């Protein structure tokens, strides 16, 4: 096929201006950035709702095998049967863990998985001629991506309030359901780290109204191998392989937001779904080929390493570590937003501390940097004032949790005795308190030429 000329309007009039940088300078630049960065391999990283667990390096070794890195998605399938086996086995294991019937690995990340799952729900209702179902119900404690994904899929979002206990208000859910209900998006355990104990009643309410129930797998790490979303009444789910199944995440990817569903939604799956998909009712591809295949390789390595028993132990360890740290911090004088046992994460509120001392959640988080720890998630969920959300994960040792608790206890004492010290934090990092608003609105993302 002959090349077609680029239209004149899109051709360069002159050669592009490119940086002239020595390889040694490039190497030093990235080495310096690496020294300034902080990751799970550097220290305690309790970033709530992000599951920053240690990722076994075995997964990296296997994902680097030439048999995986040297394939091409358009080569004949009989020449890539090993790769096909990876997708099949990983999908089967994840269906077993979630209680779903089918799995697709096309979505490239969590929010992409949400969007895909919602398109399945939409296709289901449209195919049945039930086009009046245009509302997705979302708890007020949900991840911000939930309402955003629902809006992108063409739905109207209706918020469901939480009770004082941090759980979905059943009566409010019942009142919100109706003939316009397409579905409910839910995380369980929820975003404040509590298990929705009325989950069976909740899914029954939505199903009785004619809607479907979507499981946001962001917090699956707390229940994998113990309880299955499919058994709770969920019809479709997404999984963050780059969180729960120990494939590195952060920095923009690659990720994998695998989507699983019950048999009633299988006809609508994207074309490369396991066990079928791609028929007349399919929503169509949401990503080219098999998407981020090497992330699936890492996840399969993790699953095969742990086995059934290990997967359950990982979930139990995550819950144990969260409750241990929560108890230590409460004993030190911190206030929990929701007292009692938690699941894999918990939320502290510094509202009273701020009123008493002027020290905010931001101040404490910045001070943690000086202690060699990554801060927890700040000011989320939005229903908790001055929130700090901790998720220690199962890969942290008791000694690490003890050191973290001791450091946080010392910071609390400093907040009460010398609040100005926390207002000035951090003092040991290369960057102190940048103008985050300016950074978000005017990012510097290209090479800066020295003029003159």
What are the residue ranges of the model-derived segments?
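Non-catalytic terminal extensions of PLP-dependent enzymes
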Residues: 1-102, 119, 227, 279, ...
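Conserved PLP-enzyme active-site core in the AAT-like
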Residues: 21, 82-85, 112-281, 320, ...
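Conserved phosphate/anionic-ligand binding catalytic regions in large, soluble enzymes, centered on
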Residues: 38-58, 106-117, 245-260, 290-295, ...
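Glycine- and other small-residue-rich loops at beta-strand/loop junctions that grip anionic moieties
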Residues: 48, 106, 139, 187-195, ...
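Short, flexible loop/turn elements at secondary-structure junctions
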Residues: 51, 109, 142, 190, ...
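Cysteine-centered functional microenvironments
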Residues: 72-75, 105-107, 187, 243
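A short, small-residue-rich loop immediately preceding and capping a beta-strand
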Residues: 101-107, 135-138
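Mobile "lid/hinge" segments at catalytic clefts and subdomain interfaces of large enzymes
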Residues: 254-326
């Amino acid at each position: 096929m002959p090349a077609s000329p680029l239209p004149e309007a899109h051709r360069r009039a002159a050669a592009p201006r490119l940086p002239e940088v020595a390889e040694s300078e490039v190497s030093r630049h990235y080495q310096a950035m690496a020294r300034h960065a902080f990751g799970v391999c550097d220290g305690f990283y309790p970033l709530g709702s992000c599951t920053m667990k240690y990722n076994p390096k075995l997964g990296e070794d296997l994902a680097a095998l030439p048999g995986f890195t040297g394939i091409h998605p358009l080569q004949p399938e009989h020449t890539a049967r090993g790769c096909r086996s990876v997708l099949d086995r990983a999908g089967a294991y994840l269906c077993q863990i979630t209680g779903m019937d089918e799995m697709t690995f096309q979505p490239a990340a969590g929010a992409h998985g949400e969007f895909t799952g919602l398109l399945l729900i939409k296709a289901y209702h449209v195919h049945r001629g039930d086009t009046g179902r245009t509302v997705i119900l979302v708890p007020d404690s949900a991840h911000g991506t939930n309402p955003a994904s629902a809006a992108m899929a063409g739905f109207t979002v209706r918020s469901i309030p939480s009770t004082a206990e941090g759980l979905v208000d059943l009566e409010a859910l019942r009142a919100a359901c109706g003939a316009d209900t397409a579905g409910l998006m839910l995380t369980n355990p929820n975003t404040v780290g509590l298990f929705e104990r009325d989950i069976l009643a909740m899914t029954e309410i939505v199903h009785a109204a004619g809607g479907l129930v979507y499981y946001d797998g962001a917090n699956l790490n707390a229940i994998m191998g113990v309880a299955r979303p499919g058994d709770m009444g969920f019809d479709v789910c997404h999984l963050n392989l780059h969180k729960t199944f120990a494939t590195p995440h952060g920095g923009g990817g690659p990720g994998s937001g695998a989507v699983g569903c019950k048999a009633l939604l299988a006809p609508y799956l994207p074309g490369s779904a396991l066990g079928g998909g791609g028929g007349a009712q399919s929503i169509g591809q949401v990503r080219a080929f098999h998407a981020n295949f090497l992330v699936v390789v890492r996840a399969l390595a993790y699953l095969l390493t742990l086995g059934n028993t290990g997967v359950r132990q990982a979930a139990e360890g995550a819950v144990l570590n969260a409750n241990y740290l929560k108890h230590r911090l409460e004993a030190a004088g911190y206030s929990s937003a929701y007292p009692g046992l938690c699941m894999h994460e918990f939320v502290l509120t510094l509202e009273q501390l701020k009123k008493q001392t002027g020290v905010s959640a931001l101040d404490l988080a910045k001070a943690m940097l000086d202690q060699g720890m990554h801060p927890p998630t700040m000011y989320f969920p939005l229903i908790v004032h001055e929130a700090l959300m901790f998720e220690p994960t199962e890969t942290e040792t008791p000694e690490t949790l003890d050191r973290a608790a001791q450091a946080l206890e010392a910071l609390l004492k400093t907040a009460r005795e010398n609040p100005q010290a926390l207002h000035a934090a951090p003092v040991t990092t290369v960057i102190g308190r940048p103008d985050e608003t300016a950074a978000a609105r005017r990012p510097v993302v290209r090479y800066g030429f020295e003029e003159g």
